[in-house]
């Protein structure tokens, strides 16, 4: 996903790739060789905020609408369009959250799905919440 950074007059591109350390190092080297690339940041071991957006259109008849809206509320999703036969939802979160919502809504009939893929920014606080989850710590602010 490519997003223009208004403050610097540059664009930011987020890529999610899988591979061993050698493959990722080679990819980083190749990207850094490109003329218009100012830098490459590997977020693998950094404290970062990661999110993904999903738009989902689900069949919603009168007798199922309240059940669907209950699920939507639990996932903190937003209803962005309504018709007699369908609801269009917007949900933001980690991929696990999006997949869980999709699975719960499948029985109602998913008509369309669009997903952005991950976007990420380094955490200013430096706190790696993923490591807190792994170590079963809770963070209270």
Regions found by a protein language model. Name each.
Residues 27-30, 34, 67, 71, ...:
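Generic non-transmembrane alpha-helical segments
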Residues 9-18, 86-91:
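A generic structural motif
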Residues 1-2:
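Short, small-residue-biased leader/transition segments that mark boundaries at the very start
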Residues 7-12, 50-52:
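A short, glycine/Asx- and small/polar-enriched loop/turn
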Residues 67-90:
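Strongly charged, low-complexity linkers/loops
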Residues 35-47, 77-84, 109-123:
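Conserved short beta-strand edge segments in small beta-sheet-based binding/regulatory domains
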Residues 19-59:
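Helix-adjacent hinge/juxtasegments
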Residues 49-71, 92-107, 123-141:
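Short, low-order "capping/linker" segments at domain edges
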